[in-house]
Swiss-Prot record:
GO terms for molecular function: rRNA binding; structural constituent of ribosome. It comes from the Bacteria. Keywords: Methylation, Ribonucleoprotein, Ribosomal protein, RNA-binding, rRNA-binding. Residues 135-154 are annotated as: Disordered. Belongs to the universal ribosomal protein uL3 family. The lineage of its organism: Bacteria, Pseudomonadati, Pseudomonadota, Gammaproteobacteria, Legionellales. Part of the 50S ribosomal subunit. Forms a cluster with proteins L14 and L19. Methylated by PrmB. It comes from Coxiella burnetii (strain RSA 493 / Nine Mile phase I). GO terms for biological process: translation. The modification N5-methylglutamine is found at Q153. This is Large ribosomal subunit protein uL3. GO terms for cellular component: cytosolic large ribosomal subunit.
């Protein structure tokens, strides 16, 4: 992982290019990303930044965390996240520094991680795109049933990982190689091409892409 930002998904809109093409984008607001701890190879065995984002009342923070924020001389945040660093990345940064959207640039490709919308208990048709069974021809009860879930005496059990009904959504998901269309430094906004996981208002973590596109190779 490389240095990144934590933001809040605001929703989707579209912007137009000079040629008149419409590009769907997701607006992400980056709210007060502060470095609370700098981890080094000497002290921790690896290089990383611990980042707090957002604001939280000091009365809502337990004493160990309050002491941690006080040591870094930063306001309490909603949560802490850690970003692993390469050997040459941001070597001069220190605890208390604020990270802003200008660490990314327009046209850069990023990975975005977020918590998907929870959809409750779902059947196999909705959860795994199973086809439905016959509507008629003697079928009166099993239109959306999954069908057989295994064999008989051998193996005498249901295989692990069998696609069945269950909880849908409410899991962390990462979308890769999303292009940054616009960086708004004044309002601390990132406009990222396409849809991102999660509901509006949800937390998203933006990092440099772990893959290279063909045109970048």
């Amino acid at each position: 992982m490389s240095i990144g930002l934590i933001g809040r998904k605001c929703g989707m809109t579209r912007i137009f290019t000079e040629t008149g093409s419409s590009i769907p984008v997701t607006v992400v607001e980056v709210i007060l990303n502060r470095i609370t701890q700098v981890k080094t190879v000497e002290t921790d065995g690896y290089r990383a930044f611990q980042v707090a984002y957002g604001k939280k009342s000091s009365a809502r923070v337990n004493k160990p965390l309050a002491g941690h924020y006080s040591k870094a001389a930063v306001e309490a945040g909603n949560a802490l996240r850690e970003f692993r660093l390469g050997n040459e990345e941001l070597t001069e940064a220190k605890a208390g520094d604020e990270l802003k959207v200008d660490i990314f640039k327009e046209g850069q490709v990023v990975d975005v991680r977020g918590l998907t919308r929870g959809k409750g208990f779902a059947g196999t048709v909705k959860r795994h795109n199973f086809r439905t069974q016959d509507a008629t021809h003697g079928n009166s009860l099993s239109h959306r049933a999954p069908g057989s879930i295994g064999q008989c005496q051998t193996p005498g059990r249901v295989w692990k990982g069998k696609k069945m009904a269950g909880q849908l959504g409410n899991v962390y998901c990462t979308v890769q190689s999303q292009e940054i269309i616009k960086v708004d430094v004044e309002r601390n906004l990132l406009l990222i091409k396409g849809a991102l996981p999660g509901a509006p208002g949800g937390e998203v973590i933006i990092t440099q892409s772990s893959k290279k596109r063909k045109e970048d190779k």
